[in-house]
Every structure is written in structure tokens, then in C-alpha cells.
């Protein structure tokens, strides 16, 4: 199999491997179609005549329209296809009420926190409240590596440039994100490291935290002590003693929270990796667990796939408001809503934002959507959640971590080395990338395109890897020491 027609209603097929000019392809319901030109892997070929202005249909949905008459066998891409997207949309709620049959959950070997939550890692996190102390945090983290022993699995710091010279909602958003990170169950202990004179004050962080475990969350203002390294190591040593009391134990998979993300997508993302991840999401939800889908701009053009699965009118209204609110965000900055596909996306076969979005939302599987979370919000309802956040890889995976995700499933057709604070599994879309960047890979979904595994079989394999990762198996990014954050900024710099 070297091509696929994703939906019987599609007027295109996708090349699973490079298709040479003159190659004949049998298309169900159409007959034989001969490639009129070379079709790169992941790219689209017309299987029917399409008149100028008519829609290109893929995934059973329009992904744009052709700019001129198209004949069967022609290559369809950015040179002859244009988006249909514009601004806000008045969405209608047409509920489908999908049902996920419950399944008895397996267990993974995790940590049980004092407040009853489950964790997949047992770490200490140093969170700077301002960029001025990033290097202090780095030195403090390096000095604290001697504390990593027994059940304490790591000490990490998360540098960023913010926390000062911000105002209003932008400043509040940074503060909420940092506090949300501190609540993550994988952090057995947290040190908020401040300078002492920044806008993101100690009192503001305390107010944002509300009621919290004062043994687990500690503070240090560098301007208040003679030697911040000595004081910092003392605090981290105390947190390490607390963390080492935790031991791995069996925990039901119903307590897992997984994040769903894609980056560096290609034309196979929506055919191999993303639907595999979507099936894993459904498996987690069926076991009583939680999954979180973000990247709002990469839902544009595929909204109905998600909105019709909202479990209630209230959830639908919140989702519709989030989608249109994000479009307003673009427009308020003088940007059009559809300029999303990157050069790498286009090189891999993604033509329009609708094309990208229809593939992106495959990660959400088929479960009902139970809640809509703001940026820096935490998932509290079991089932599939939507999270407000941009498409940017590091910003959105940071938001997924802040939402409480224990493991993040990250599909990519181009490859990327980074890792979020939460374990980040890289799911590759194609065999070529697996061969080229094996050191970045955790799971090869390219086996779906080659026919070695079905989607269901690949999903079973990936789900087992999720359980192993939750039980302590390191991801590729963790093995390479990648633990990074990026904060969504939307405001002036003083």
C-alpha cells in the first residue's frame, strides 16, 4: 500500500511513500488514477476532476479550494490550493453523544502523594519567579545533584525571561503558570527562587497558591540572604529528605492524566501518529483516566469534529468561546487566523491550516469532551479536556504540564529534541525520520504507513509504553537531560 484515501468522500489520496509520475493507483469507487507528476511522501493527489473554486476534501472535510481546474492525477499543494478560513464563526451545537465503553484499568508503578494524588516521577523543581535569577537557579541545581539518590529521581530548574516588567493580565498569566507548575504531582518538592524586587512578588505567589503544603513548597529571595547558594542547598536538602520517603507502588491507570500534542507535523501525521495517539486517549478515558488536548489554532477548520462531541451545552459554549476568543487574539494583533502551517509542515505535505487541523484533532480520539480549561488551568474532570493554548511546541507542552499531565504524547513528522517538565514521548510519523533521528524517538508510528501494524495494534503498543513510562522508564528527552518550559506572553515589556 503506497497511498491512502482517508475517507470515502475524499477527492484526494495521500502518498504514503514517494509516488513517481506515471504510477497507476487503484482508488475504490473511482478506478485507476495515474499520477500526472511526481507526488512526494505525505502529499496529496487528486482522484477526481475538481473545478476552479471547488473544495479539496480530505478526512471527509473541506481543507481549502483549488485555484484552477484540476485533473485526476495532479499534485495538490500550496501552488494550487487556498484556505477557506477567515475570521470568527457562529458555531452550532449538533451533539453526537459518543459513548466510551468502560474498561477495567491496569496499574502502573507510581508515587502516591500525601494529598492522595498520583505521580509518575519523584523530583525536586526549582522555579524562578523572575529571569534575573536563572543562572543562580542553574548553579543551585548543579550543586544539588549530590542529593539525587534512593527514590529521588532528579533535581531540575526551569529558566524563563519573565516575572518582571510585565503588567496586568500578562503579568497575572505568568504568575498563574508558575504556580500551576508548582502544583504538579511529579514535583515532590518545589523551591520558588526570587530576586526580591520583581513584579512577581512573594506575596502574589502566596495569594495565587492559596492553601498549600508548606513542607513541600519553599521560598528563597536572593536579596534577603548573604549566600543564596548555601541557603538554597539547605532548603533543597530538606526537600530531598521529604522526597526520599516516597516509594513506587501500584496505582490504577484511571488516575493517569495524559497530554496530547503534535509539532513539526507532516502529511502522515493525521494518518499514522495522531490517530494512534487518539486511540490511546480513548483507551485512557475508557479506564477512567484523563486526557488533555490543546493547540487551539490547530483546531481551526476542524472545529466540528470536536464541538459536536461536547457533553453538554455549557461545555460547547465554553469551547466555542475559546475558539473564537483565540481568533480575536490573532486579529487584535493584526494577524490572519490561517497563517499557521510552517515551512516544515508544507514540505511534509500539509497545504492549509484546515489540512493541518483535521490531522491535528485526530489526537483527540472519539471520546466526549467533558471540560474546557483556561491557560494555566488544571484538569479536574476525568475524560477528554480541551485546554486553551497556542500551537507553539514548548508553550503548549508547558501548559499541558501545568494542567497536571503525567505523560505527554507528542507526535512529529520532522523530529524535535526538547522535553517538557512532564515526561514527553516523541511519536514519529514516518519510517524515514525514525531511521534518521533514532536518538530523538520514543515510538515509531510509521509502521502504520508501512503496513507492519494496524492503528489499533500501534495504539496498544503505545499504551503499553505509556504505562512503562509512568512506571519510571525514561523518555528519549529525559535520557538527554531535556526539561524545559516556555511561557505564553501577551503584553508590553516595561
What are these regions (language model features)?
Residues 1-407, 414-417, 422-494:
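Metallocofactor- and cofactor-centric catalytic cores in central/energy metabolism, strongly enriched
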Amino acid at each position: 500500500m503506497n497511498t491512502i484515501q482517508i475517507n470515502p468522500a475524499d477527492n484526494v489520496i495521500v502518498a504514503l511513500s514517494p509516488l513517481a509520475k506515471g504510477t497507476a493507483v487503484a482508488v475504490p469507487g473511482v478506478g485507476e488514477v495515474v499520477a500526472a507528476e511526481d507526488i512526494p511522501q505525505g502529499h496529496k493527489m487528486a482522484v477526481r476532476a475538481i473545478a476552479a473554486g471547488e473544495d479539496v476534501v480530505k478526512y471527509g472535510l473541506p481543507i481549502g479550494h483549488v485555484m484552477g481546474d484540476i485533473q485526476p492525477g495532479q499534485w495538490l499543494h500550496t501552488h494550487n490550493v487556498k484556505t477557506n478560513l477567515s475570521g470568527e464563526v457562529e458555531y452550532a451545537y449538533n451533539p453526537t453523544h459518543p459513548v466510551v465503553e468502560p474498561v477495567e484499568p491496569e496499574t502502573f508503578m507510581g508515587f502516591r502523594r500525601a494529598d492522595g494524588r498520583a505521580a509518575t516521577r519523584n523530583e525536586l523543581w526549582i522555579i524562578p519567579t523572575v529571569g534575573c535569577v536563572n543562572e543562580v537557579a542553574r548553579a543551585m541545581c548543579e550543586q544539588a545533584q549530590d542529593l539525587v539518590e534512593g527514590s529521588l529521581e532528579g533535581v531540575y530548574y526551569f529558566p524563563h525571561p519573565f516575572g518582571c516588567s510585565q503588567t496586568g493580565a500578562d503579568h497575572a498569566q505568568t504568575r498563574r503558570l508558575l504556580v500551576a507548575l508548582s502544583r504538579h504531582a511529579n514535583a515532590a518538592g518545589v523551591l520558588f527562587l526570587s530576586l526580591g524586587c520583581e513584579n512577581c512578588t512573594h506575596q502574589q505567589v502566596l495569594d495565587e497558591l492559596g492553601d498549600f503544603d508548606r513542607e513541600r513548597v519553599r521560598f528563597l529571595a536572593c536579596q534577603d540572604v548573604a549566600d543564596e547558594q548555601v541557603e538554597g542547598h539547605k532548603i533543597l536538602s530538606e526537600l530531598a529528605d521529604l522526597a526520599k520517603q516516597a516509594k513506587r507502588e501500584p496505582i490504577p491507570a484511571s488516575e493517569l492524566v495524559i497530554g496530547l500534542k503534535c509539532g513539526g507535523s507532516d502529511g502522515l501525521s493525521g494518518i499514522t501518529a495522531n490517530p494512534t495517539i487518539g486511540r490511546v486517549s480513548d483507551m485512557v478515558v475508557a479506564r477512567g483516566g484523563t486526557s488533555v488536548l490543546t493547540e487551539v489554532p490547530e483546531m481551526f477548520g476542524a472545529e466540528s469534529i470536536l464541538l459536536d462531541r461536547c457533553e453538554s451545552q455549557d461545555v460547547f459554549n465554553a469551547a466555542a468561546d475559546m475558539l473564537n476568543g483565540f481568533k480575536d487574539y490573532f486579529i487584535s494583533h493584526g494577524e490572519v487566523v490561517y497563517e499557521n502551517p510552517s515551512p516544515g509542515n508544507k514540505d511534509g505535505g500539509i497545504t492549509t491550516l484546515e489540512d493541518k487541523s483535521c490531522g491535528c484533532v485526530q489526537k483527540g480520539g472519539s471520546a466526549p469532551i467533558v471540560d474546557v480549561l483556561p491557560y494555566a488551568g488544571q484538569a479536574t474532570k476525568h475524560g477528554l479536556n480541551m485546554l486553551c493554548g497556542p500551537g507553539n511546541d514548548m508553550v503548549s507542552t508547558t501548559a499541558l504540564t501545568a494542567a497536571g499531565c503525567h505523560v505527554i504524547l507528542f507526535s512529529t513528522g520532522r523530529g524535535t529534541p526538547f522535553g517538557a517538565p512532564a515526561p514527553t514521548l516523541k511519536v514519529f510519523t514516518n519510517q524515514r525520520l525514525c531511521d534518521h533521528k533514532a536518538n530523538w524517538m520514543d515510538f515509531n508510528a510509521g509502521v502504520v504507513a508501512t503496513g507492519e501494524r494496524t492503528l489499533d495494534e500501534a495504539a496498544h503498543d503505545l499504551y503499553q509504553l505509556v504505562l512503562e513510562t509512568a512506571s519510571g522508564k525514561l523518555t528519549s528527552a529525559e535520557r538527554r537531560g531535556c526539561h524545559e518550559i516556555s511561557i505564553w506572553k501577551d503584553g508590553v515589556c516595561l
